[in-house]
Amino acid sequence: MTTNNKQRQTWSSRLTYVMTVAGATVGFGATWRFPYLVGENGGGAYVLLFCIAMIVIGIPMILVENVIGRRLRVNSIDAFGDKILDKGKGISKYWKILGYMGLLGAFGIMAYYMVLGGWVISYIISLISGTLDISTPITKDIAKNFYDLHIGNSPYEIIFYTLLFVIVNYIILAKGIIGGIERSVKYLMPLLFIFLIGMVIRNVTLPGAMEGITFYLKPDFSKITPQLFIFVLGQVFFALSLGFGVLITLSSYLNKEENLIHTAVITGFTNTIIAVLAGFMIFPSLFTFGIEPNAGPTLVFQSLPIVFSHLWAGKFFAIIFFGLLLIAALTTSITIYEVIITALQEKLRMCRGKAIVLTLSGIFLLGNIPAILGDNLWKNVTIFGKSIFDFYDYASGNILFMLTALGCAIFVGFVLKDEAKKELSSTKYSTFIKIWFNYVKFVVPLIILVIFISNLF
């Protein structure tokens, strides 16, 4: 990174920024959530709709958040502040509510996201120690019993592994934006790609893999419905970390010479490519060994260990696979944490070290532990009929993210207006900018409203 005249650091290159954003958006969205949703929703039909949705709503919204973030180059709250407009024009202070909603959504997702990271560490350690023995083929019952014993019924074990994951995040974040986040993604993202490509090559060459590839790539058009498309549109927000300040915060470190249109398109396509590769990593092996692809959220943790137990060097590939999941989770978690840390630093004039400790410990105590206990010792505790874990997921993903994203689109279309166009004026795509602006102003809010209403019912 370099430092500009406002003493705010900037990414050292577009590649560094794109790698960081890719890390922020890949996470469990591409490696865990995308594959099981494909399995539940018609295979190729879901993949096709996801690619369309990335163009319809994903890339336009990436550009929205990039414009907001780079405009003032501040935290995700002050990005909606009264100094956003040129010539001293003021705006309502209530727009900052969007920033606070984004922070609340970030807290909600991290409350359960870090727990999933703890699950992955648990599996890696169990594979290495032999507690999860896949040296010989295992049955569905064995895989389920292991999951129930070590994930479902061992809250203190998961609390320990989640804390371990938090500590790894702390080590990276404590080194700052330059020495921590930027440097880590330079190594972690290439490593993730190497692991991912290696697993894809291994699995698409299995006997019978073509059946899985066909399921994955050949759309069943009878499965495509308006309801499914609305659902997929909503999943793109999760996949791209839209609506809770991540892209606003990361783009605030972009220099003014960077082409925001290029970075938005590259970000969207990078996320899509990684998600699609994750499917190639999983579905051929499922069909090779006759495992149903519609296992839902437990697909990775219950079905895939069965697959690995049938493979030559299955333990090695299982460790690589869960290592890949851990890297994806880590590159996302450090950037979501950074949204809150940056806000605390700039809003409360808090030193970075104190902001990191407050953020990580606060989420661990108020979010991670309740989410873990909510599926065990506190399983009778419900919030609006949902477990604590599921409530965090629902409230952040279905309500807060959607409302914040809706507000961002309206903010750019009706408040920033010409200022948003000026932020893109250094590019040569004047026609595209006009189309994008009107699309964001009139079409995107309607799409988000439809998704939001659909999520509620």
Swiss-Prot record:
Q: Which UniProt keywords apply?
A: Cell membrane, Membrane, Symport, Transmembrane, Transmembrane helix, Transport
TM spans, by residue? 18-38, 44-64, 101-121, 158-178, 188-208, 228-248, 273-293, 294-314, 316-336, 355-375, 396-416, 433-453
Give the CC-aspect GO terms: plasma membrane
Q: What is its main location?
A: membrane
SUPFAM superfamilies, per database record: SNF-like
- Where does the record say this protein resides? Cell membrane
Q: What membrane topology does this protein have?
A: Multi-pass membrane protein
Domain of life assignment: Bacteria
Q: Molecular function terms in GO for this entry?
A: symporter activity
Q: What does this protein do?
A: Putative sodium-dependent transporter.
Indicate what this protein is called per its UniProt record.
Uncharacterized sodium-dependent transporter HI_1690
